A protein has these predicted regions:
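Core dinuclear metal-dependent hydrolase active-site scaffold
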Residues: 1-60, 118-138
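Cap/insert and terminal regions of metallo-dependent hydrolase folds
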Residues: 36-120
């Protein structure tokens, strides 16, 4: 266990699923495709039902691990049916996040992509009727 290596912590962060007025979002933290696969399996087995989680209803996803190649699999995007994705990454970061592979998967699923490196702060506002609006604040 190399806790001095920053990569050690990848895949060990919180995942938050939120539902408000019928609009749901998942915040994947620094999680990878391994966690995505586990979440899909647990959802299919009904293990998330006790918490009121319905991953298949997820419309908004904050992609995992800043959009690295090891997150946001095509299978996960298909499972979620997300229409909006937020990628949190620094401008000209040394890791090349988000990767072209991840962006290609998002575009293949016709997901509306918002990126903090390009768009600045991204805000999603959900109204009382369940509708939502995504906007950027530079």
């Amino acid at each position: 266990m190399d806790t001095e290596n920053p990569d050690y912590y990848d895949g060990k962060s919180s995942v938050v699923w939120l539902d408000y007025m019928g609009t749901s979002a998942i915040f994947m933290g620094d999680e990878t495709t391994e966690t995505e696969t586990k979440l899909m399996r647990e959802d299919e087995e009904g293990l998330l039902d006790i918490f009121g989680v319905d991953l298949r209803s997820t419309e908004i996803v904050k992609v995992g691990h800043h959009g690295s190649a090891y997150s946001t699999s095509l299978e996960f995007l298909q499972y979620l049916h997300a229409s909006v994705a937020v990628v949190s990454c620094g401008e000209n970061n040394p890791y090349g996040h988000p990767t072209q592979e991840t962006l290609a998967r998002l575009f293949a699923m016709e997901v509306d992509v918002w990126r903090t490196d390009r768009d600045g702060h991204v805000v999603v506002t959900v109204s009382a009727d369940g509708s939502y609006k995504t906007r950027k604040i530079k």
